[in-house]
Swiss-Prot record:
GO terms for cellular component: plasma membrane. Keywords: Cell membrane, Lipoprotein, Membrane, Palmitate, Signal. Residues 1-22 form the signal peptide. The keyword Membrane applies. A lipid is attached at C23 (S-diacylglycerol cysteine). A lipid is attached at C23 (N-palmitoyl cysteine). It is found in: Cell membrane. Belongs to the staphylococcal tandem lipoprotein family. The keyword Flavoprotein does not apply. It is a lipid-anchor. This is Uncharacterized lipoprotein SAR0442. Pfam families: DUF576 (PF04507). It comes from Staphylococcus aureus (strain MRSA252).
Length: 256
């Protein structure tokens, strides 16, 4: 009888321990707020900015998971575009995407010019092949427009001049989460005194004095994933006019 009583006491004690551990461990699982977790996830790449010499990426390794084959050093993809609506039914979008293969230490991509229409009309898109050597963009396709040719050859990615060393100082953002994807978003009001905003205004024709919004979007695991992606947008849009810069830097398997 005493033996059974001791067993009962042990079981009761075990239940109490499990309950306390579960309740106490809840905060550990939750940890930082989702806003802080999103910023920390972005900081893994934004801390690398500014990447003045893109060839430095050949010697940097990103987050690796089971999608990488053995021996694959991976590939960095950097992207920047500037979109602006010129009419109520048109949106012009120009930018560049560059893939830097760490296995071959080569960088290839393209500059794109797109025009979107709201009405029943297909969008126009033209890609111009480029490569990078000695941190210089080399245009591979023939371009007759001298202004476009100059824009391509002198193009700089946002990540080459952006600086987010003070990212932790951004607080009280508007957070939204889609658990089905999952995806995470946070938005911050920026100041026109922000150096990143000043840089963009000096490089692009932004016809508004409105201070922009910084929008950070993550698809996939906050801890990191080669399947998901992170996108940063600085949105100057006002009323019915869309004006924004989109940037991302991702690390994925080079061998598929």
């Amino acid at each position: 009888m005493g033996y059974l009583k001791r067993i009962g006491m042990c079981i009761s004690l075990l239940i109490v321990i499990i309950f306390v551990t579960s309740c106490g461990g809840g905060n550990k699982i939750t940890g930082d707020s989702k806003e802080t977790q999103i910023k920390k996830s972005f900081a893994k790449t934004l801390d690398m900015y500014p990447i003045k010499n893109l060839e430095d990426l050949y010697d940097k390794e990103g987050y690796r998971d089971g999608e990488f084959e053995k021996g694959d050093k991976g590939m960095w993809t950097i992207y920047t575009d500037f979109a602006k609506s010129n009419k109520s039914d048109e949106l012009d979008d120009e930018g560049m995407v560059l893939n830097l293969d760490r296995n071959t230490r080569t960088a290839k991509g393209y500059y794109f010019v797109k025009k979107f229409y709201e009405k029943d009309k297909f969008s126009d898109r033209k890609n111009y092949k480029v490569e990078m050597k000695n941190n210089k963009i080399i245009l591979l396709d023939k371009v007759n427009d001298p202004n476009l040719k100059e824009r391509i050859e002198n193009f700089k990615f946002f990540g080459q001049y952006a600086n987010f060393k003070d990212l932790e100082n951004y607080n009280n953002g508007d957070v939204s989460i889609n658990w089905n994807v999952p995806s995470y978003d946070v938005e911050y009001k920026m100041s026109n005194k922000d150096e990143n905003v000043k840089q963009l205004r000096s490089r692009y024709n932004i016809p508004t004095d409105k201070a922009p919004m910084l929008k950070m979007h993550i698809d996939g695991d906050l801890k990191g994933s080669s399947v998901g992606y992170k996108r940063l947008e600085i949105d100057f849009s006002k009323e019915d006019r869309d004006i924004s810069v989109i940037d991302y830097l991702s690390y994925k398997p080079a061998k598929k």
